[in-house]
Amino acid sequence: MVVPPSVAPVGNVGNFELGGQAAGLPSGTMQYAGMTWVKKQYKWNPGDPPEAVAGLINEAHASGMKILLSIPGQLAPSSIDFEAYTTFLGGVAALGPDAIEVWNEMNIDREWPAGQIDPTSYVNNMLRPAYQKIKAANPNVMVITGAPAPTGYFGGCGGGGCDDAPYVAGMMAAGAGSASDCIGVHYNEGIMPPSATSGDPRGAGGHYTRYFQGMINAYTGAGAGALCFTELGYLSGEEWGTLPAGFLWRAPYNLTVAEQAQYLAEAVRVGVQSGRVRLIIVFNVDFKTFGDDPQAGYAMIRPNGSCPACETLRQVMGQ
């Protein structure tokens, strides 16, 4: 039995809110942990009717949760139909979700056509038209930019791929601030406490993407206003005794379950106290798959059904 560490409440959270990405909808567990949001991802295909996501919205609201819909799409096969996609988002907004994230990790060629990666194109062709159509349909929907993939791999920014901080700087220069309510952020490779900015044992240990505080600092430095962490995860393989090679950043299994619980709560504290973070969505609440992509290792609800992070998050949120 993992006994989670005791965590002091952060105090006044202001307009900060907490949620989780869930495979199901364990709303009672989530609400116990201080969460008011659930994130669901829907992969858009040209021709999809907006009603395809109505069930997700209705289920969340019936459970007393707000819902963030992350809506990436097909590359089909080498271009994106911006008009069809943004029209779809306008139709979704009319159904009453609480937030929409416009695409996903558009700085890498897994999520954007190779050779066409460009923050200015994203803002002009996708984000701004989407923002206008969403707000026309329902001005209460929060519009979050797609979160870039955190990376220093490209050493800059080009059509084949773009590091996330220069991508965000490019988005802001193109006017993303007036075409969104929040800048999306992903952070899921951490093995250091959330307040740390140095000491990571991996190569490139000084790179900002290794650190939660580093991400806040880098995106703020790139000109971003309010930040919404639409994926925040800490990976523990403790119950399995190991992790796949691509996810093993500190032997034998990155973090203990107790560390995961502590770091998630500390990330909330650091985020709230920064004054920069509007929303944190924990990745994830209840995923059960553990393979080449060890999603269950990120889960708050562990294989034995316990949820140490539920206790630490509840405490830090002052529940």
Q: Each predicted region: which residue ranges?
A:
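Boundary/entry segment of secreted carbohydrate-active catalytic domains
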Residues: 3-45
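Aromatic-rich peripheral "rim/lid" segments of glycoside hydrolase catalytic domains that contact
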Residues: 9, 21, 30, 106, ...
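Short, acidic/polar
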Residues: 20-32, 52-53, 80-92, 160-174, ...
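Aromatic-lined substrate-binding rim segments of carbohydrate-active enzymes
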Residues: 28-31, 35-98, 110, 114-146, ...
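Glycoside hydrolase catalytic-domain groove-lining segments
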Residues: 50, 54-58, 184-247, 268-277, ...
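A structural motif corresponding to the C-terminal end of an alpha-helix
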Residues: 60-64, 94-96, 129-141, 174-179, ...
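Active-site groove signature of glycoside hydrolases
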Residues: 88-120, 142-152, 178-194, 229-232, ...
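Aromatic-lined carbohydrate-recognition surfaces of secreted/lumenal glycan-active proteins
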Residues: 127-168, 211-212, 216-237, 276-287
